[in-house]
Design a protein with these regions (language model features):
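Hydrophobic h-region of N-terminal signal peptides that target proteins for export
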Residues: 9-18
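Core segments of small alpha/beta cavity-forming domains
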Residues: 20-94
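Second-shell loop/turn segments in exported
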Residues: 20-22, 105, 159
C-alpha cells in the first residue's frame, strides 16, 4: 500500500468518525454531567450540556454565582464583606469536593414520557463527627466582632470537618430515544450551599 493511499484511507476513516454523532448519554451519565456543571463549575460539562440541549452558556462565572449566593450583592469593601468572600471561597472548594455521582437508575416509563430514577451519592461535611473541643464563644462577642468571629468559625469547620456520604435520588426524563435526559427535581445550587452550611445545633 502506497503512503498516499494509506493517508487517504486514514483521512476517510477520521472524517467518517467525526461525522458520526455521539451517543446520547444514559440517565446516569446525564446526571453526572449536570452535577459537574452545577456543583463543580466544570467548564467541559457545561459545554457538553450546551451542545446536547442547545442551552446557552452561562454569562456569570460559577465562582461569582457561589459568591453572590453566600455574600449577596454587597459592594462595600469592609471586614464583613471580606469575611463573607473568604467563606464563599471555602464553600466553592467544598462544593467541588462533593463529587456527586450516580450509582444506578431504575426506569419508570409512562405512555408519553421516559422516566429514570437516578440514585447518587455525594460527599458532605460531617460536623457531628467532629470533636467539640473548646466551647464556641463567638456568640458572646459584641456586634460585628461576634459576626466576623462566627464566619471565621464556620470557615474553620468547613476546613476541618471529615466527610460523610449523602445519598439521594433525582428524576430524569425525556420524551423519546433521541432526546437528552434532563433533571426534573435536582436541588438548586442555593440548596446545596445550605446543606454544606447546615451546622449542628
Amino acid at each position: 500500500m502506497t503512503p498516499r493511499l494509506l493517508f487517504f484511507l486514514l483521512w476517510v476513516a477520521s472524517t467518517a468518525a467525526a461525522q458520526t454523532p455521539a451517543p446520547t448519554p444514559t440517565p446516569e451519565q446525564s446526571f453526572d454531567l449536570f452535577a459537574r456543571f452545577m456543583l463543580e463549575g466544570d467548564a467541559d460539562a457545561e459545554a457538553r450540556i450546551a451542545a446536547l440541549t442547545g442551552m446557552p452558556m452561562r454569562t456569570e462565572r460559577w465562582e461569582d454565582a457561589v459568591d453572590r449566593m453566600v455574600v449577596g450583592e454587597a459592594s462595600a469593601d469592609n471586614a464583613r464583606t471580606r469575611a463573607g468572600r473568604d467563606l464563599s471561597r471555602q464553600v466553592a472548594l467544598a462544593l467541588r469536593q462533593t463529587h456527586c455521582r450516580s450509582t444506578g437508575s431504575e426506569r419508570h416509563d409512562g405512555e408519553d414520557v421516559q422516566v429514570a430514577i437516578v440514585a447518587y451519592t455525594c460527599q458532605v461535611p460531617d460536623y457531628a463527627a467532629m470533636d467539640k473541643g473548646t466551647p464556641d464563644d463567638t456568640a458572646s462577642a459584641p456586634g460585628d466582632e461576634g459576626e466576623l468571629a462566627g464566619v471565621q468559625h464556620v470557615i474553620a469547620l468547613l476546613q476541618r470537618a471529615p466527610w460523610r456520604v449523602h445519598a439521594d435520588s433525582v428524576v430524569m426524563a425525556r420524551l423519546n430515544e433521541d432526546d437528552v435526559w434532563t433533571t426534573q427535581d435536582m436541588p438548586p445550587l442555593q440548596q446545596w450551599i445550605e446543606l454544606l452550611l447546615a451546622l449542628p445545633e
